[in-house]
């Protein structure tokens, strides 16, 4: 089992890092007492492949030797990577001032600045065990997430899932759509009696639409639009991209075009899912 340990200075972005790892498929545990790590690893190894835990100064052992012994014990059976997050003193002070949260070491006798300095002195030995040290001083949350993704090299897990979704405007817009394309202006198989009971998944409808220059031109332009901006969307730290194609009833045109777009990007090696939101309504109506 792979275990990622996220540690570092309070205010450096451990919570952001843990959310990122959760988004790419890690089972995450926040602020685990390090003494419980061997027990947790034993329990989770039966049904988890990738686990991430965050540690702050309150959960670390009092000596670096104890930490080293614990990590060595767990490494005998599992693959461990320690990621340490850092930021400069001024940035940590500003982040705490902006959030108005209390530093873990702050007491009535210890100011925020003194608490940050004390934590830095305590955590310095931990950096010697780190597989990766990230300075988040000038990083946005998206940039931090991308650094983590690149380090973990989980290309298949981090791949953006593109959902191509057909729907009927008569049933309303899909609430989860990032982009909506309206194809109600294209030639409609509904007005051809022999095609009316069929759907965009059926060969006669596909053959009819494939003969329409307007349909092919729309697919070409839409495909190019998506290809143009997809690299930026893939770098934008998102897990899903939902592209909805709508016609009047979600039965013919939108279904065919959704299939064409989805199959094209699947052939390009993208992580694609094809959905037809309104087809079930037509099938249900036909059985009644």
Curated annotation (Swiss-Prot):
Belongs to the RapZ-like family. It comes from the Bacteria. Displays ATPase and GTPase activities. This is Nucleotide-binding protein PM0169. It comes from Pasteurella multocida (strain Pm70). GTP binds at residues 56-59. Coiled coil: none annotated. NCBIfam families: PRK05416.1 (NF003828). ATP binds at residues 8-15. GO terms for molecular function: ATP binding; GTP binding. It holds the Pfam family PapZ_C. Keywords: ATP-binding, GTP-binding, Nucleotide-binding.
């Amino acid at each position: 089992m792979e275990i990622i340990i996220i540690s570092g200075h309070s205010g450096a972005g451990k919570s952001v890092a843990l959310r990122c790892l959760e988004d790419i498929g890690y089972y995450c545990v926040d602020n685990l007492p390090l003494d419980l790590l061997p027990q947790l690893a034993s329990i989770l190894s039966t049904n988890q492949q990738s686990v991430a835990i965050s540690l702050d100064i309150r959960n670390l052992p009092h000596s670096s030797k104890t930490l080293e012994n614990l990590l060595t014990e767990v490494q005998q059976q599992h693959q461990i990577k320690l990621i340490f997050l850092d930021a400069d003193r001024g940035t940590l002070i500003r982040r705490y001032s902006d959030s108005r949260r209390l530093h873990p070491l702050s007491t009535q006798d210890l100011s925020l600045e003194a608490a940050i300095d004390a934590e830095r002195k305590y955590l310095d030995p931990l950096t010697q065990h780190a597989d990766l040290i990230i300075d988040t001083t000038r990083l946005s949350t998206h940039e931090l997430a991308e650094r983590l993704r690149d380090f973990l090299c989980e290309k298949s897990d981090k791949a953006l899932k593109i959902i191509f979704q057909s729907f009927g405007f008569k049933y309303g817009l899909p609430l989860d759509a990032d982009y909506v394309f309206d194809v109600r202006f294209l030639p409609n198989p509904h007005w051809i009696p022999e095609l009316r009971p069929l759907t965009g998944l059926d060969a006669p409808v596909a053959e009819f639409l494939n003969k329409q220059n307007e349909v092919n031109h729309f697919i070409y332009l839409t495909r190019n639009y998506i290809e143009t901006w997809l690299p930026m969307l893939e770098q934008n730290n998102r897990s899903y991209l939902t592209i909805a194609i709508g016609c009047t009833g979600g039965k013919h045109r939108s279904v065919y075009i959704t299939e064409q777009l989805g199959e094209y990007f699947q052939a390009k090696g993208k992580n694609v899912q094809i959905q037809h939101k309104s087809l079930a309504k037509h099938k249900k109506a036909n059985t009644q």
